[in-house]
């Protein structure tokens, strides 16, 4: 779980740095959003699994973390839309000039 979160954080920081320098592409930002949201859902599901039945009750924040993480999958464009955008950008990069 730790590795997944740190990987997403490092990727987001790199894309943010590229934005600051003005060298960012749409595929990088879409990839960053997609990877971070999928990592968040995966980690929150693992947290619920680790807690067992307690993961579903409101005494632990794992349930809320999952709901919040899932919102990133569907909010501001779904990950399927992001995949299509990334594929389109990669295809355009391979076309001869």
Where are these regions (language model features)?
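Alpha-helical interface subdomain recognition
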Residues: 1-97
């Amino acid at each position: 779980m730790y590795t997944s979160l740190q990987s997403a954080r490092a990727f987001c920081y790199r894309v943010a740095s590229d934005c600051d320098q003005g060298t960012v592409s749409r595929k990088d930002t879409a990839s960053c959003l997609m990877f971070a949201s999928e990592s968040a859902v995966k980690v929150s599901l693992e947290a619920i699994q680790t807690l067992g039945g307690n993961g579903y009750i409101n005494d632990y924040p794992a349930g809320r973390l999952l709901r919040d993480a899932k919102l990133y999958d569907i909010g501001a464009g779904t990950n399927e839309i992001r995949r299509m955008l990334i594929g389109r950008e990669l295809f355009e990069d391979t076309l001869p000039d």
